[in-house]
Amino acid sequence: MTGLFQLVSSYSPSGDQPAAVQKLVTNFHAGIAKQVLLGVTGSGKTYTIANVVEQIQKPTLVMAPNKTLAAQLYGEFKAFFPHNAVEYFVSYYDYYQPEAYVPASDTFIEKDSSINEYIEQMRLAATKALLSRSDVLVVATVSAIYGLGAPEDYLSLRLILSLGEHIEQRQLIRHLTELQYTRNELDLVRGSFRVRGEVVDVFPAESEMEALRIELFDGEIESLSLFDPLTGQTVRKLQRFSVYPKTHYATTRERTLSAVDTIKDELKEYLELLYGRNKLVEAQRLAQRTQFDLEMMAEVGYCNGIENYSRHLTGKAPGEPPPTLFDYLPPDALLVIDESHVTIPQIGAMFKGDRSRKETLVEFGFRLPSALDNRPLRFEEWEVRSPRSIYVSATPGSYEFRESAGEVIELLVRPTGLIDPEIEIRPVATQVDDLISQINACIKLGDRVLVTTLTKRMAENLTEYLSEQGIRIRYLHSEIDTVERVEIIRDLRLGKFDVLVGINLLREGLDMPEVSLVAILDADKEGFLRSTSSLIQTIGRAARSVRGRAILYADKVTRSMRAAIDETERRRQKQKEYNAENGIVPKSVVRPISDILEGARDGVEVKSKGKGRRVDEVPADYGALNQAEIAAQMKMLEQQMYQHARDLEFEDAARIRDQIQRLREAGLG
């Protein structure tokens, strides 16, 4: 089923938003390929894009630079489009150690990974939505440029079921196993099916909560329905349903056997090359590893590391780019690149790092040369595959300006009337003493302070010194994982401490209305952390407070500082003029402090058959868990949920299911 994008919001566009939406939509319909949306912090860039999506009515891919921002955008778009398919496509690895070889120490490191099955389910849901409906918006990271199964294989393998269709049960089961579904008569879990008489139950790999029941009679589909796999309760009847493969890498038996033949040919050719170079150890190693993989593929259809043979499985020529999420997009889709000044350089860097590691594996006989084609897209390949695009940033880079050829739409006026922070320059010599007095002044007003330094050592020393002065302060460093980072930011907003010190973690996507002062130490030291873009982004962290200020501690004004100050002043001037013309009095953003890690903090009291009552052990504070541990916790709870279902304790099973759902949302952070 497909419909139209329907934006749900209690607000209507204001400030620069109506003009920006109109211009972006007009340019899109005119066929303009690249546009820039230059939007200041708090100007409603996400809401503006949501309005554009509603008006153009095209499938949309939104790319973010990291999982944290992707999760934030996913939540916002999900709220804007509750009746449409808003999907999430990020790396499904909680932990990933790629295979590698270190020649200097003759050390081979085996691939080791931990897959988050909930993220995998969301990835499958994203590709299914792209192939089956037009009202779909996918939020992704650079994971979107990595190799995926070919969409034509994914589509050709699907099992299309219709009411009244003739299909033998044995034929149905065979097709499900080709889709890599496993038969499980005890637990109907995601990616499995069970057979009871003439009823076949299937739990689609991309489904979050609903399973499919196929009722046959005399070789004919008599009934199709979705049901709750926990309670068995029917959710709704269906006329038609498509079961998609359990994995993006599923392929036909014929294609697999064909790939085995071409891999054998490549192996023979490369072994001759290695023997010719007198690399006997490498040749023996390669022959042994590859022959084992070939036997596994011929017998069971897959092997560990099968992605290294993806070129053979997809029938691509050597050097051809792999199929990616971009191949699932229709030609008329819209691509939105959020924080483009960070995301675009990331896209260019992915290929180079991947290539050097694999070249070493090939050279020393751990992989065939075709493994080099299991890779992310090169930057130029990504450019070719990108549909019409909008680059969104407060500080677009030179690439975005060049590609958009002057099509820059500005979003400088905030709906709240807030103006950009006032900037002051103060001397370096007295920066610490001055900073203490500024912090104390902010604390008296109940405000918070962000301080950014150049080095880790300076951040640590400053944190220690200010703490000795009685200031409640925390240090946000690169070793802190995503979940703990969110907890620290929440604690700052709650007032558990007043000052947050960081190096390069205080720029994009931090929404803290309580922060009224940003202090940038050693602002005159030119470099990546003190570039024009970095300075503007950091200054913008104080833009959600009516008392927002930025202090740059510097002995001279560098070119980057001058550009950042001039641009901020230009924006302030336009914002002041708009407020004066419309009689708007600036007021700070008021945003509730929601605990995104809430839920599942309390023990769930349930009954265990024959064992009296028990309380399932649930950690009191998920801030202490990383994403891998959260995934393990969800897996444990899921096992308990299915046990309750088998014991016919459906209320208890449903309660744990709700807990898993809250945990899953927390894990997206």
UniProtKB/Swiss-Prot annotation:
GO MF assignments: ATP binding; ATP hydrolysis activity; DNA binding; excinuclease ABC activity; helicase activity
Organism lineage: Bacteria, Pseudomonadati, Pseudomonadota, Gammaproteobacteria, Lysobacterales
Pfam families assigned to the protein according to its UniProt record, in alphabetical order: Helicase_C, ResIII, UVR, UvrB, UvrB_inter
Gene (name only): uvrB
Entry protein name: UvrABC system protein B
Stored CDD domains: DEXHc_UvrB, SF2_C_UvrB
Residue ranges of every copy of the Helicase ATP-binding domain listed in the record: 26-183
Main location: cytoplasm
Domain-related comment: The beta-hairpin motif is involved in DNA binding.
